[in-house]
Amino acid sequence: VGFKAGVKDYKLTYYTPDYETLDTDILAAFRVTPQPGVPPEEAGAAVAAESSTGTWTTVWTDGLTSLDRYKGRCYHIEPVAGEENQYIAYVAYPLDLFEEGSVTNMFTSIVGNVFGFKALRALRLEDLRIPPAYSKTFQGPPHGIQVERDKLNKYGRPLLGCTIKPKLGLSAKNYGRAVYECLRGGLDFTKDDENVNSQPFMRWRDRFVFFAEALYKAQAETGEIKGHYLNATAGTCEEMIKRAVFARELGVPIVMHDYLTGGFTANTSLAHYCRDNGLLLHIHRAMHAVIDRQKNHGIHFRVLAKALRLSGGDHIHAGTVVGKLEGERDITLGFVDLLRDDYVEKDRSRGIYFTQFWVSIPGVLPVASGGIHVWHMPALTEIFGDDSVLQFGGGTLGHPWGNAPGAVANRVALEACVQARNEGRDLAREGNEIIREASKWSTELAAACEIWKEIKFVFEAMDTL
């Protein structure tokens, strides 16, 4: 029997509504917007084909392998409520399509060429189910939440951070001075801005040295373990590891990486180095909005968060929720749980399309940062709980009396909120009152309350279910 050449509909091979998914399959939920005249089944099947074994025409080499064993399958399609001509297409991928321990390879297949496919007007990857059989091939975060708490000897409260501003232009010595003031005032961490790498006004080695001096001085004065996220992101992997090695030689606890601009291969290499050498790894998500902001095209952040948990990181930025709409709060808390918890049930109201079981992969601390200040502290404490990092950049450095009083104000506000919560008070209802009470005995907090009492960031939610 000769092989039959020609073009045939994808749905004849790749749309299989009777397929029962296997425990080892990687499952994907795509939001598909077909071109006019393309039926949803054909669009869903095209996604399955182009992200696995298919191409646009029948090829004779198909006969040299078992397509049934290796092909992706679109096994279910449902219309998106309230949207015209949008569908959720569920696709199952056999595990053997992917290299073990490689987020890079997984994404190259699942979100590769298929996103430029002409039969689709738009395509968004909403969620991925990573099976234990695949996640066990990854190291995951270098240390995880519990090990980090033990290293820092800090329990029972969120951790406090601050991004040093202005983000660009400070000399290394002035940068170190700003770090020292913040840590002395009561913060647990300070942070390199994501754009700070090794520029002419501040080379990385100078910054690392002045920062280490600030760290040891602040630790000696406060009796607490302190950290500064030293950004090791660089133009090459070799240079990145060189910076991490120098950080380790200085004896500091944590380094940082921009995982999307740096790339998953570099990130996974750095995560392995950090575990082997006892360094915590803070992850910034610069560039995420390019990928996840459009609601009908791209990749949802919950997928990027899962990918980071596989690739490795101990902290990752995760938005703030505060001052946004309720719908966004549920979606944000959905991926915060996917970062922290071992087992997360499917819950479409929070945007979670699949039950996710992480088995032995450690959890990641979500970092709330961006436009937050002391008046937000009760809401942040309630929403994110103890296992989080609350990061106030302008909300520390913008204090009228300087960095250290700004840090004091944040620490006092946090301790007051944690104590009130532990006493059974309702932070959502009594939050402002709790902050006012605390400001009576902390002049630093009173000054912060006064300067930021009118500031609000209220916009429509971009991300809806």
From Swiss-Prot:
Requisite cofactors: Mg(2+)
Task: Show the Pfam families listed in the entry.
Answer: RuBisCO_large (PF00016), RuBisCO_large_N (PF02788)
CDD domains hit by this protein: RuBisCO_large_I
Example of a GO biological process term: photorespiration
Chief localization: plastid
Q: How is the cofactor bound?
A: Binds 1 Mg(2+) ion per subunit.
Query: What GO terms are given for molecular function?
Result: magnesium ion binding; monooxygenase activity; ribulose-bisphosphate carboxylase activity
**Residues reported in the UniProt entry to bind substrate:** 113, 163, 167, 285, 317, 369
List site positions: Transition state stabilizer: 324
Q: Which domain of life is it from?
A: Eukaryota
Protein EC: 4.1.1.39
Q: Which reaction does it catalyse?
A: 2 (2R)-3-phosphoglycerate + 2 H(+) = D-ribulose 1,5-bisphosphate + CO2 + H2O; D-ribulose 1,5-bisphosphate + O2 = 2-phosphoglycolate + (2R)-3-phosphoglycerate + 2 H(+)
In this UniProt entry, the residues modified to N6-carboxylysine are 191
Sites where N6,N6,N6-trimethyllysine occurs are at 4
Modification comment: The disulfide bond which can form in the large chain dimeric partners within the hexadecamer appears to be associated with oxidative stress and protein turnover.
| Keyword Transferase on entry | no
Q: According to its UniProt record, where is this protein located? A: Plastid, Chloroplast
- PANTHER family, per this entry? RIBULOSE BISPHOSPHATE CARBOXYLASE, RIBULOSE BISPHOSPHATE CARBOXYLASE LARGE CHAIN
What role does this protein play? RuBisCO catalyzes two reactions: the carboxylation of D-ribulose 1,5-bisphosphate, the primary event in carbon dioxide fixation, as well as the oxidative fragmentation of the pentose substrate in the photorespiration process. Both reactions occur simultaneously and in competition at the same active site.
Under which name does UniProt file this protein?
Answer: Ribulose bisphosphate carboxylase large chain
What is the protein's species of origin? Nepenthes alata (Winged pitcher plant)
